[in-house]
Design a protein with these regions (language model features):
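Catalytic glycan-binding domains that act on GlcNAc-containing polysaccharides
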Residues: 6-157
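N-terminal Sec-pathway targeting helices
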Residues: 1-3
Length: 157
């Protein structure tokens, strides 16, 4: 039993804790959700770059980073871990204001805001805006994975 618990602590670290706590509080985002996104996106590898060009801990696309920097009025660098976290946490906060449900927020983080808005318009959401189906298999798996890690972080810490 103890070995299993230790395994989860090793698999679900709280790296960058000070920075994640600070920006999560600033932008009103659940820190455990941020850890789950970072764990899923990059496994806490600051130098991660996806085949599609997403960069850093939170795997932010350069075009999204540009939008975030313009909106915040700040000059931030995707390759600097603290800046990447600031952008990603702000972006989650932005998506939380657009969508009422965490699954929709996560789907938009993964597939894009416009894509999820299209799904909602095309009947993939219930009356309260919750996604009833996610047409992209990759995004469906992503949302499940982040939710799994999110629940694990909530239980462990």
């Amino acid at each position: 039993m103890i070995a299993a618990i230790l395994f989860f602590y090793v698999m679900l670290p709280k790296k960058y804790e000070r920075v994640i706590q600070e920006f999560s509080q600033e932008f009103g985002v659940d820190g455990d959700l941020v850890y789950a996104v970072v764990r899923t996106e990059s496994n806490f590898r600051a130098d991660a770059v996806s085949r599609r060009g997403a960069v850093g801990l939170m795997q932010i696309m350069p075009s999204t980073a540009e939008f975030i920097c313009q909106t915040l009025g700040e000059k931030l660098d995707l390759n600097v871990p603290e800046d990447n976290l600031r952008m990603g946490i702000w972006y989650i906060s932005y998506l939380e204001k657009k969508f009422d449900h965490t699954d929709a927020v996560l789907a938009a983080y993964n597939a894009g805001e416009g894509t999820v808005l299209g799904w909602i318009r095309n009947g993939y959401a219930g009356e309260k805006g919750e996604l009833t189906d996610i047409p992209y298999q990759e995004t469906k798996i992503y949302v499940r994975k982040v939710n799994f890690f999110y629940n694990c972080y909530k239980m462990l810490y």
